[in-house]
Amino acid sequence: MAEVRNYTFNFGPQHPAAHGVLRLIVEVDGEVIQRIDPHIGLLHRATEKLAESKPYNQTIGYMDRLDYVSMMANEHGYVLAIEKLLGIEPPIRAKYIRTMFDEITRILNHLLWLGAHALDVGAMTVFLYCFREREDLMDCYEAVSGARMHATYYRPGGVYRDLPDSMPKYKPSRWHNEKAVKKMNEAREGSLLDFIWDFTARFPNLIDEYESLLTDNRIWKQRTVGIGVVSAERALQLGFTGPMLRASGVEWDLRKKQPYAAYDRVDFDIPIGREGDCYDRYLVRIEEMRQSNRIIRQCVEWLRKNPGPVIIDDYKIVPPQREVMKRDMEALIHHFKLFTEGYIVPEGEAYAAVEQPKGEFGVYIVSDGANKPYRVKVRAASYPHLAAMNEMCRGHMIADLVAIISSIDIVFGEIDR
């Protein structure tokens, strides 16, 4: 009879299921995991330190690059902290736009998570379906900011610009003939709000497609049910937030418990799980996409009926419009000062947190009364989840390790910062 041996091996950082540059030192007894030691820091870019050497308005772009799948949600946390220090409130239309794009970002994140999670476990079709829908939502990003990912769209006091009246259209190419392009452009004939409305009308049926492939699939359930279980009490002790905490049965969502933007004006439900396993995390995120779709439709209805300003009218914080700057000397001076030294933030400290797709994303800023922050501390949502890897994986098979990693939904941009 062959002897069962203990091994210690490296998982990652170059591994397709590592979701970035994750390195795990895994100790196994035969094929059963005994201990896991996560090693982080391979994607460290000193974002918090960089923020100390840049004016406040130049750090917004760094936030996009932390969790680079939840771009605008990261920006939201940062600008909320600045708004607290400045004592300003964005216009109500800007709040609704932020709420709408936070939920678009949530769907973008969950679609990538679902596709990658399914692919890690061995289901390829869902991955292709999810990326089909992500293209439409990235077009929304591009319409308001010109960028498909790193938008830098939120500003202290509002958003960069109002929603456009037209959508970018596809042109015939080597990959898409005229017939295909015509079909793709059907929903792009109107405004951005028309395009989003069309998407939200189609999206629930598309979620049903994903569920028909996975939810009752025997192999999917064998790979996820009872895997990586964390109880509600233990999840709270470990500092879990977001879908990871809600899957364990704790009804905690900052959008409901500490409302920001326009979340106190829209109607939605918080999905929670019971078992705290990989399967419950999947079900919670699927239902979150349905609730996000519901929130987006409410925002579109309100935005259609209520035009108005999307950023405060204060030249000491917000640059004047180009046509005003060209003819008014005082506006030109404000414009020059804002783009050279930025704005001065009063001395003090502020913490702002948002319900980012992965959990609570918090930004703590200390100001010494200058145009640059004295200290910026980012609370990454995925950090406590990765720290609990040893506890979640102990006693499971090596194959279950991949399912647990992908159920956490980690992005190393925010963990390593």
From Swiss-Prot:
GO terms for molecular function: NAD binding; NADH:ubiquinone reductase (non-electrogenic) activity; quinone binding. Keywords: Cell inner membrane, Cell membrane, Membrane, NAD, Quinone, Translocase, Transport, Ubiquinone. It catalyses: a quinone + NADH + 5 H(+)(in) = a quinol + NAD(+) + 4 H(+)(out). Pfam families: Complex1_49kDa (PF00346). Gene3D superfamilies: Cytochrome-c3 Hydrogenase, chain B. The keyword RNA-binding does not apply. InterPro entries: NADH_Q_OxRdtase_suD (IPR001135), NADH_UbQ_OxRdtase_49kDa_CS (IPR014029), NDH1_su_D/H (IPR022885), NiFe-Hase_large (IPR029014). It is an enzyme of class 7 (translocase). Its EC number is 7.1.1.-. It is found in: Cell inner membrane. It is a peripheral membrane protein. GO terms for cellular component: plasma membrane. Belongs to the complex I 49 kDa subunit family. NDH-1 shuttles electrons from NADH, via FMN and iron-sulfur (Fe-S) centers, to quinones in the respiratory chain. The immediate electron acceptor for the enzyme in this species is believed to be ubiquinone. Couples the redox reaction to proton translocation (for every two electrons transferred, four hydrogen ions are translocated across the cytoplasmic membrane), and thus conserves the redox energy in a proton gradient. NDH-1 is composed of 14 different subunits. Subunits NuoB, C, D, E, F, and G constitute the peripheral sector of the complex. This is NADH-quinone oxidoreductase subunit D. The lineage of its organism: Bacteria, Pseudomonadati, Pseudomonadota, Gammaproteobacteria, Legionellales. The gene is nuoD.
